[in-house]
Amino acid sequence: MATDIDMLIDLGLDLSDSDLDEDPPEPAESRRDDLESDSSGECSSSDEDMEDPHGEDGPEPILDAARPAVRPSRPEDPGVPSTQTPRPTERQGPNDPQPAPHSVWSRLGARRPSCSPEQHGGKVARLQPPPTKAQPARGGRRGRRRGRGRGGPGAADGLSDPRRRAPRTNRNPGDRPGAGWTDGPGAPHGEAWRGSEQPDPPGGPRTRGVRQAPPPLMTLAIAPPPADPRAPAPERKAPAADTIDATTRLVLRSISERAAVDRISESFGRSAQVMPDPFGGQPFPAANSPWAPVLAGQGGPFDAETRRVSWETLVAHGPSLYRTFAGNPRAASTAKAMRDCVLRQENFIEALASADETLAWCKMCIHHNLPLRPQDPIIGTTAAVLDNLATRLRPFLQCYLKARGLCGLDELCSRRRLADIKDIASFVFVILARLANRVERGVAEIDYATLGVGVGEKMHFYLPGACMAGLIEILDTHRQECSSRVCELTASHIVAPPYVHGKYFYCNSLF
């Protein structure tokens, strides 16, 4: 028996006299339940695998003494009493003496294990009491098993109020739950477990019946505090005052010091000397050209009737003028600048004639399959024709296009869609806007589709003079249909613009 005692002491088991008492054998069903409840992957090789294969002789009592006790019934099941399964009877040899009622175990006290609980992950670690609880009374393995199981301390209170039951996740050094369920005395429902939840260790197995802890506070989305409506608004810097600076004011006032009748007269004289020779001695070559009268400079006003040509004449002699523009780029650049200035100062009838001139020139080029060149003086000044017509017809077209259910003038010129063409007015502005856009973009050559002409087609839908005749017609028609007196006056003044009323005074303090 001395040998058995030494072996038990060396194993580090804290056994009392009650562990060696003779108890009835443990049922197999209770043992299986106990093994399932402790199946966390942690087992002690020092006490569960020491079965002696030689029968009843030898250290057989060590196996029975170290065998895990049966987990008691769960106290949370109502109506099921907490019973203890009797321990199996210790088997003894025929020559072994009976243990005394008061043996040496009751006087030795607790034996300090040879290794720390942290280093021992087996049954030694599981037998340690929770660090937050007081040391239980020495009552053998049954008392400690009762404290570890679900029927431990606090089970009676848990039966009285199951709603106040809260899981305890205090870990023992062996990474086992210290207690199954416990109650927080006086704590409200659900508050006991919220303050004691601990997450499972990284990489370790998740224990059944233990709730996961909520994520840390730093990972939660925290809304900013609401702004106090009574708090003063942040100060904003006042924008800089929009004024004329002092230097510019001095420059404006200094004009009076330089302005004089003599200087104004000298300015008119110098300008008149430049205009008779705009090409600077390098005009278009006009020898033996049918276009010689218009290629050279002219001192008098332009008379459209003296420059009238038929469509057949334009078709016959148009290519020679086209080649003149293409073969003299410097003269063509000068002619383009001069034409732009002239077109922006034309009256309404002259502006309509310029629109017809541009479209008829494009039709002639298409007729002879000539490229539409943006450097051409006629095609390159389309924007001037468009701007002048839009300025003169804008007051009238606001009423006319709205009455016809068409797009506004600005929208027609910005969209530049062939599908928006519904009459002669929309045709003129859309086609001129498309040509001006291509010239502004600086394309090398304008395709015929810009004017709505398909492949292999001619510009048969346009007849020279349609711009002037068509726009004068709609002015007269709408003036009779519209009941607005303002619209009638506007349309009449566009067609026949003699001065009747409008200017009130002329003020000049300088000369």
Swiss-Prot record:
<keyword id="KW-0597">Phosphoprotein</keyword>
<keyword id="KW-0863">Zinc-finger</keyword>
<feature type="region of interest" description="RGG-box">
    <location>
        <begin position="138"/>
        <end position="152"/>
    </location>
</feature>
<feature type="short sequence motif" description="Nuclear export signal">
    <location>
        <begin position="5"/>
        <end position="17"/>
    </location>
</feature>
<feature type="modified residue" description="Phosphoserine; by host">
    <location>
        <position position="18"/>
    </location>
</feature>
<feature type="binding site">
    <location>
        <position position="487"/>
    </location>
    <ligand>
        <name>Zn(2+)</name>
    </ligand>
</feature>
<keyword id="KW-1192">Host mRNA suppression by virus</keyword>
<dbReference type="GO" id="GO:0042025">
    <property type="term" value="C:host cell nucleus"/>
</dbReference>
<dbReference type="GO" id="GO:0039645">
    <property type="term" value="P:symbiont-mediated perturbation of host cell cycle G1/S transition checkpoint"/>
</dbReference>
<feature type="compositionally biased region" description="Acidic residues">
    <location>
        <begin position="35"/>
        <end position="51"/>
    </location>
</feature>
<feature type="modified residue" description="Phosphoserine; by host">
    <location>
        <position position="16"/>
    </location>
</feature>
<keyword id="KW-0488">Methylation</keyword>
<keyword id="KW-1262">Eukaryotic host gene expression shutoff by virus</keyword>
<feature type="modified residue" description="Omega-N-methylarginine; by host">
    <location>
        <position position="148"/>
    </location>
</feature>
<keyword id="KW-0479">Metal-binding</keyword>
<dbReference type="GO" id="GO:0039524">
    <property type="term" value="P:symbiont-mediated suppression of host mRNA processing"/>
</dbReference>
<feature type="zinc finger region" description="CHC2-type">
    <location>
        <begin position="399"/>
        <end position="487"/>
    </location>
</feature>
<feature type="compositionally biased region" description="Pro residues">
    <location>
        <begin position="213"/>
        <end position="232"/>
    </location>
</feature>
<feature type="region of interest" description="Disordered">
    <location>
        <begin position="1"/>
        <end position="244"/>
    </location>
</feature>
<feature type="compositionally biased region" description="Low complexity">
    <location>
        <begin position="1"/>
        <end position="15"/>
    </location>
</feature>
<dbReference type="GO" id="GO:0003723">
    <property type="term" value="F:RNA binding"/>
</dbReference>
<dbReference type="GO" id="GO:0006355">
    <property type="term" value="P:regulation of DNA-templated transcription"/>
</dbReference>
<keyword id="KW-1190">Host gene expression shutoff by virus</keyword>
<feature type="short sequence motif" description="Nuclear localization signal">
    <location>
        <begin position="110"/>
        <end position="138"/>
    </location>
</feature>
<feature type="binding site">
    <location>
        <position position="482"/>
    </location>
    <ligand>
        <name>Zn(2+)</name>
    </ligand>
</feature>
<comment type="subunit">
    <text>Interacts with host RBP1; this interaction facilitates the RNA polymerase recruitment to viral transcription sites. Interacts (via the RGG box) with host ALYREF/THOC4; this interaction recruits ALYREF to viral replication compartments and probably directs viral mRNA to the TAP/NFX1 pathway. Interacts (via the RGG box) with host SRPK1; this interaction relocalizes SRPK1 to the nucleus and seems to alter its activity. Interacts with ICP4; this interaction modulates ICP4 DNA-binding activity. Interacts with host NXF1; this interaction allows efficient export of HSV-1 early and late transcripts.</text>
</comment>
<protein>
    <recommendedName>
        <fullName>mRNA export factor</fullName>
    </recommendedName>
</protein>
<comment type="similarity">
    <text>Belongs to the HHV-1 ICP27 protein family.</text>
</comment>
<feature type="region of interest" description="Interaction with host ALYREF">
    <location>
        <begin position="104"/>
        <end position="112"/>
    </location>
</feature>
<keyword id="KW-0805">Transcription regulation</keyword>
<dbReference type="GO" id="GO:0030430">
    <property type="term" value="C:host cell cytoplasm"/>
</dbReference>
<keyword id="KW-0244">Early protein</keyword>
<keyword id="KW-1103">Inhibition of host pre-mRNA processing by virus</keyword>
<feature type="modified residue" description="Phosphoserine; by host">
    <location>
        <position position="114"/>
    </location>
</feature>
<dbReference type="Pfam" id="PF16852">
    <property type="entry name" value="HHV-1_VABD"/>
</dbReference>
<feature type="compositionally biased region" description="Basic residues">
    <location>
        <begin position="139"/>
        <end position="149"/>
    </location>
</feature>
<keyword id="KW-0804">Transcription</keyword>
<dbReference type="Pfam" id="PF05459">
    <property type="entry name" value="Herpes_UL69"/>
</dbReference>
<keyword id="KW-0694">RNA-binding</keyword>
<keyword id="KW-1121">Modulation of host cell cycle by virus</keyword>
<comment type="function">
    <text>Multifunctional regulator of the expression of viral genes that contributes to the shutoff of host protein synthesis and mediates nuclear export of viral intronless mRNAs. Early in infection, this immediate early (EI) protein mediates the inhibition of cellular splicing. This results in the accumulation of unprocessed 3'end pre-mRNAs which can't be exported from the nucleus. Cellular protein synthesis is thereby shut off early after virus infection.</text>
</comment>
<keyword id="KW-0862">Zinc</keyword>
